[in-house]
């Protein structure tokens, strides 16, 4: 064995490549071994250093891959074990054990996390060259007994199913020990680069290779100063020193110092020496030179997005200077925090990249499909799961529009559970859903699922066959091929599909002869899919490499950007969370010689120093170290390592926000520039965070309050949300000439509430999602229907009998049966409505001097100027003198207010009066009024009554009165009825004024509507708060910012309010 060490300023790879070339020139076969995470980059670096740029004599690979070169022909043809297969084997082993067989772990038999921990422990045992019987000295002896039962049973299953229990390195070591490879190894030289420690498995193999190979050469970075130190605790080279010293002691050799022809920039060497001096308690009498600082940059950004954008701009600048993507390496402090953001931002700047991390399959549509399938079976056809299956794009041949229509209907009809999905869809609404089409679609979905889900407990092989048949019926493979939109997606889908078929194969092999329920089968496949990962190789080598910073090696690339280096992530603190604690691992290691567990937490300090040293020397030209103030929505501090660099004299540059400038980095890329311009166009919306907006909104409110006390006024913000008018073509389609514009009292109210709301409801015809479950609209229909039946009943039956009959027959209508007999909640609502009917009905019995002459009367009122007002009058009454009036049923309290009417927010009663005047017989000229009847079950506070007497009854009937507009001429006839006429009497001239002004409101609104320009102007009554519909989710209206856009209502003092508003109406309606 030969041990080599060198300073950080030299290239260890060059030194080892020279050793490999010498061996190859002598006719030896050379294996150049690199760590798993670096083999790809190391191969490229080694080939670059070879003069011939390639050779068959030197193979750059990993330990595991090297073993296959020697054992591929002699290894037994057994099944391969991967993590998913191991998990299935442990699941099967636990199935065969009873809870009482496992005192410590009996309750965790079906826990997926516990099974994952068993897999990890089994792999650790293999790497540590230990068996489960070596787990002595545990905190609880019962743990070892349980683990022995589980693992031995699992190993028995592996033998029965012909799985290879040995790892590739174990098979290689066994072949060497048996002398099967002596001839080959005698002509082999092993070169090992990039290691600072070996696992027990690698350590054992190395001892065998040293005895049988021609030579084993190992290199590591250690300074001569550190090598001569006797005390190395806390030294930045502590990990490498321990590594070399242990090997030297074990194999009785002395490490030699070597140098390379290539010498890296002295700036990095000087920084390394300062870093070393800080940690070995020595001093240097010099500082970094001014030109050294040109090779280092320390950035500080506010949050991750800004940080990544600054890196992307800097990369674009490097390209402008003539460098290639492959010259750049990006290191991440927290891979999980940055992985989702860095891709879209690099795509925006058109930077090709390769993320050096296996991608989890959990977000792939195939995994989502399998998960939805499993949940559909487990939770009895839950609607969300069925829809998620369809939306994955892998179930059947359905268009997106068909799926949207199916989803809309199932939400409306509340279709959930097998019972409802299996029955034909029959319920419909005013939207007239295409039930024939939906039922065909329902059958295409239900039949294959029903066939699969009815499977009883049976052999696993039979379940897999049925699952495959189901997947064929729904055309899963064809749909999977149709998902890909690019070559990269095609490659990803191929990897995912291969993983999926491997999982099915493993399940069939392990559980083929075991009886299982379908739910267990789907759960196992789902767990395997969610935990699986895949990796896609980049199509070109000229890409920016992205990986975790703790996988970096010295002198990796000319330019290195390390981001996310906060105190929480640099250095990293690794802790085990498996079935064995670190203390238990340490006790096991004490009584074993060459076999031992790796205890990461025990090596955190020296490993972090080694990582920091590699990071500071990762670049050969320029190193950028960056830290965000906020990461994962949490404030974090500077890394202690970065603080050391600041003490060395490196300045911390605050990069600030990304503002558009004339720099090449800002305008040099079209796609990035376009996104910047779009962002600036929206600057008024996004320049502050939600937290900042909330803060300044509260401050502004407080400031206005203080100014008001001092009789000062703050100018209203001119910030406005603008809308564009409709094009002439659209106006002609929506409001064609010659066809009257159709309006209603409700539409007019919506228009004056907020013009944009009218545009959404009556121009775009946007509607809220319907539901079969009763809401206020359906409750109102029910109450209207009962009272309509009651008032039509002119028989001599007692009133109470008539009421019972009206309720009974209304309840028997098919629509109300579907709505109110669907569940207990709907039945309770029906009972409440019946109470309201019984409470309100007596008012109809008391008014014996009126006659109901019509109900649910449709009308069309011609307002002139091509305006047609339509509506339905709930009831038309006639007094004994022949005068007519209208009644509008309301499920909530309503009262006519002349101010509200003047502002266009309450035109209903006056509109109905105008319609009644038009449709009334010619011999009837007098109208006695228009009124609301609040359908309610009056609630009284009994505490306010001293005793239960007639006063209580009077209070109940006082709440049940007609409120609205009444004719002063009919005052005497109204006095005997339940009419609240106080402050509600109008003369005939005043009623005519109301009717004229009502017409003016319609004409004014119609004129504006036909122009096709709808403002975002919810109304405000006081100029401080907004009462109109703001539609925040659509318009982004904010009362404090957009008050200038709100429509200010006209308000008058209560004194002479009626007369003043009538005067205003006369002026405006005669303009």
Swiss-Prot record:
Subunit structure, as described in the record: Heterodimer of AddA and RexB.
Keywords: ATP-binding, DNA damage, DNA repair, DNA-binding, Exonuclease, Helicase, Hydrolase, Nuclease, Nucleotide-binding
InterPro entries in alphabetical order: ADDB_N, DNA_helicase_suRexB, P-loop_NTPase, PDDEXK-like_dom_sf, PDDEXK_AddAB-type, Restrct_endonuc-II-like
Gene Ontology MF annotations: 5'-3' exonuclease activity; ATP binding; double-stranded DNA binding; helicase activity; hydrolase activity, acting on acid anhydrides
Organism: Streptococcus pyogenes serotype M2 (strain MGAS10270)
Family that this chain belongs to: Belongs to the helicase family. AddB/RexB type 2 subfamily.
Source organism, top-level taxon: Bacteria
Role noted for this protein: The heterodimer acts as both an ATP-dependent DNA helicase and an ATP-dependent, dual-direction single-stranded exonuclease. Recognizes the chi site generating a DNA molecule suitable for the initiation of homologous recombination. This subunit has 5' -> 3' nuclease activity but not helicase activity.
Protein name: ATP-dependent helicase/deoxyribonuclease subunit B
A Pfam family reported for this protein in Swiss-Prot or TrEMBL: PDDEXK_1
Enzyme nomenclature, EC number: 3.1.-.-
Name of the gene this protein is made from: rexB
GO terms, biological process: double-strand break repair via homologous recombination
Cofactor requirements of the protein: Mg(2+)
Root EC class: hydrolase
Further remark: Despite having helicase-like domains, this subunit does not have helicase activity.
Annotated PANTHER family: RECBCD ENZYME SUBUNIT RECC
